[in-house]
């Protein structure tokens, strides 16, 4: 069989935070598949990168007092402990801000623009949302509102997470700025569009998405996006729409060729990052990227989550095809990972699964690799991490079944036969000298084809079940052969039987290790050392250990999961636990919690949302600001607040806050104050200065009561 050449990627994580367990699940799934391919002798380039561009990163960097480049670099510097810790074998990790990505993204754009059959890029003057308070055009992800297709609330400005619709931000119903909460205003701006609605794109994608590349459930969903269809609310959704691929300065990204002040929208250059990371790798090796991609036998695969199917099954293949490039051979879509019977992850409640915490507790990364493999399949179904099931599977399957096989047989070979393998012919002779052929070694070796195909099809759960079925058979054969009885004898015939049984068992263990190696790579290295063999590949399935082959002394290969480790893994942060609260003597915020009150006491305080319509300094006072508040009463309230040291009047106008609405009016030197605005501060103002006015999340309106 000729060697295959594969180019494999995972989705690019956005460079605004650490990896979460969902990232690690995807990387483990892809890594297992890649390791399997390498064990088949195939040449694989497995690459990843940080998705480094976009206004959210620009805004986060500004808040952190860093340049976007430094912000992204700091995030990237924290990737290695995760990848090394869980044995993820990427050949390269790059960034979409790399020179290679700038070069490739611009060239792909030019090729689309200059397509010989007619340009697939056009410009349109559009009305774009602008935040007058922040004085900037709003990125799609910083505009929220009602989906124009399915009318789901609080959807982002570029696509709906409920129905999957893609639209312009201006299509949102009742939009608001996620940065300030204000209603944005419209300003005209020239934008660049990729003409996905072009008949050429539609024809190509209708064929490409339905030719067997995609999982059936994914292909069926994608098929819906090509047609005019009725939504549940009676509205209609059209077919493929043109895709806005530009953003206005200020923006952290790649500037569009021949268009000063215009930048590629992050979703255009992000998938190009797959190619850029590969190019970076090949350039460093001294290999030609163009020659590599031009190889007609090259296979290209992307592992992604089901939340980004639209971009990878429509925009990405169309961009590649009409820019004259190879399209993916397949898009492998997986579901989400939930925790403990579908409970939503929450660190504060102790229902999150922090990958670094998992490692810091000394938990074996291959426990998690095996557990996820045992649950993953070729469909895009969600899977659940259940703590009890995790402990049971690892302790029963890996330790009780798999590792147990080696520990039972190795000791006899070392003590009685100088660690030498005997004749492993395939039958397990029982104490009466009769063959016990329930699971011949040749049969275990013959399972390689079935297990190999399951790996190839990403049916990891089925592969693990088949492997554990073999392990069960080996353990049953061992028990039926009763070698411990033979070990008590000094008769040559009995000892020969003992050596043969132990040799068969070790050979079975070797084969199981081979089959599990894509999932348990570190353990496989230990076993290879113990058995004194070369690195295992699938071609070794029929190459049994020869008679007289020496093995090493057996050392324990894997510990069981301790329930205390799982308890610690899901333990809420220490400051949230009653025990920690009892130990801590430092008063929160510099002052003790006030004496307890009843719910009736609290109900006497009427807290309302109020909009700050106007704010001005108070002449004669260095502490007070005069606030004009709209509390939904049909009139304005005048409230004085001692926040002048922390806020400029202009910064508060238009914001919403919390008002004590039923506080008795207070006559002051400067006028009457009709309530109180809530603000937070530390009791020790010298060491912890600052006053922080309370501001509700977007969506709250004047007059709403706080309960």
From Swiss-Prot:
It comes from the Bacteria. ATP binds at residue 347. GO terms for cellular component: cytosol. GO terms for biological process: methionyl-tRNA aminoacylation. It is found in: Cytoplasm. Residues 601-707 form the tRNA-binding domain. This is Methionine--tRNA ligase. Its cofactor is Zn(2+). Its EC number is 6.1.1.10. InterPro entries: aa-tRNA-synth_I_CS, Anticodon_Met, Met-tRNA-synth_bsu_C, Met-tRNA_ligase_1, Met-tRNA_synth, Methionyl/Leucyl_tRNA_Synth, MetRS_core, MetRS_Zn. It comes from Polaromonas naphthalenivorans (strain CJ2). It catalyses: tRNA(Met) + L-methionine + ATP = L-methionyl-tRNA(Met) + AMP + diphosphate. Belongs to the class-I aminoacyl-tRNA synthetase family. MetG type 1 subfamily. Homodimer.
């Amino acid at each position: 069989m000729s060697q295959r050449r594969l180019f494999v990627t995972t989705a690019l994580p956005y460079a605004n935070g650490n990896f979460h367990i969902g990232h690690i699940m995807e990387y483990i799934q892809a890594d297992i598949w890649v390791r399997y391919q390498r064990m088949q002798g195939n040449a694989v380039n497995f690459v990843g990168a940080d998705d480094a561009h976009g206004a959210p990163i620009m805004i986060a960097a500004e808040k952190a007092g860093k340049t976007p480049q430094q912000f992204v670099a700091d995030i990237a510097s924290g990737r290695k402990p995760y990848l090394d810790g869980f044995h993820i074998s990427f050949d390269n990790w790059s960034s979409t801000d790399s020179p290679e990505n700038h070069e490739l993204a611009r060239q792909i754009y030019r090729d689309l623009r200059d397509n010989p059959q007619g340009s697939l890029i056009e410009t349109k003057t559009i009305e774009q949302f602008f935040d007058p308070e922040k004085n900037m055009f709003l990125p799609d992800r910083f505009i929220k509102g009602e989906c124009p297709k399915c009318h789901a609330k609080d959807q982002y400005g570029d696509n709906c997470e409920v129905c999957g619709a893609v639209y312009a931000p201006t299509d949102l119903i009742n939009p608001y700025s996620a940065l300030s909460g204000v209603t944005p205003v419209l300003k005209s701006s020239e934008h660049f569009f990729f003409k996905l609605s072009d008949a050429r794109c539609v024809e190509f994608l209708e064929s490409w998405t339905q030719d067997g590349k995609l999982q059936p459930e994914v292909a069926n969903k994608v098929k819906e996006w090509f047609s005019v269809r009725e939504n549940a609310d009676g509205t209609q959704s059209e077919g493929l729409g043109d895709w806005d691929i530009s953003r206005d300065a200020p923006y952290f990204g790649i500037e569009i060729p021949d268009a000063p002040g215009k930048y590629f929208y992050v979703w255009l250059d992000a998938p190009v990052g797959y190619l850029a990371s590969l190019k970076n790798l090949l350039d460093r090796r001294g290999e030609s990227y163009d020659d590599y991609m031009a190889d007609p036998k090259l296979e290209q695969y992307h592992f992604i989550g089901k939340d980004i199917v639209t971009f990878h099954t429509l925009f990405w293949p169309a961009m590649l095809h009409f820019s004259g490039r190879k399209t993916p051979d397949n898009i492998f879509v997986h579901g989400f990972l939930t925790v403990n019977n579908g409970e939503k992850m929450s660190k504060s409640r102790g229902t999150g699964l922090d990958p670094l915490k998992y490692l810091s507790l000394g938990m074996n990364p291959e426990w998690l690799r095996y557990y996820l493999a045992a649950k993953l399949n070729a469909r895009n179904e969600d899977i659940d991490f259940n703590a009890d099931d995790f402990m049971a599977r690892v302790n029963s399957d890996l330790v009780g079944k798999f590792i147990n096989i080696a520990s039972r047989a190795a000791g006899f070979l070392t003590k009685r036969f100088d660690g030498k393998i005997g004749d492993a012919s395939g039958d397990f002779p029982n104490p009466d000298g009769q063959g016990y052929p329930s699971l011949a070694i040749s049969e275990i070796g013959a399972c390689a084809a079935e297990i190999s195909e399951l790996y190839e099809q990403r049916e990891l759960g089925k592969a693990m079940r088949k492997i554990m079925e073999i392990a069960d058979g080996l353990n049953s054969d061992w028990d039926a052969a009763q070698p411990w009885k033979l070990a008590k004898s000094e008769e040559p015939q009995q000892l020969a039987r003992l050596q043969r049984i132990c040799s068969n068992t070790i050979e079975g263990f070797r084969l199981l290790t081979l089959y599990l190696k894509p999932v348990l790579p570190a353990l496989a290295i230990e076993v290879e050392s113990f058995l004194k063999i070369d690195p295992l590949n699938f071609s070794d399935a029929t190459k049994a250990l020869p008679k007289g082959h020496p093995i090493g002394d057996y050392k324990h290969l894997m510990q069981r999961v301790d329930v205390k480790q799982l308890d610690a893994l899901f333990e809420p942060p220490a400051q949230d636990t009653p025990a920690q609260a009892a130990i801590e003597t430092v008063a929160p915020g510099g002052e003790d919690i006030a004496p307890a009150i009843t719910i009736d006491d609290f109900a006497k305080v009427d807290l309302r949302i109020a909009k700050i319509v106007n704010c001005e300094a108070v002449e004669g006072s260095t502490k007070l600001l005069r606030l004009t508040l709209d509390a939904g009463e049909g009139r304005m309230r005048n409230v004085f607040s001692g926040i002048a040291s922390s806020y400029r009047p202009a910064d508060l106008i238009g914001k919403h806050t919390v008002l004590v609405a039923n506080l008795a009016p207070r006559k002051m030197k400067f006028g009457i104050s009709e309530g109180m605005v809530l603000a937070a501060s530390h009791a020790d103002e010298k060491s912890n200065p600052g006053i922080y006015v309370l501001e509700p999340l977007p969506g709250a309106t004047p007059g709403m009561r706080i309960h």
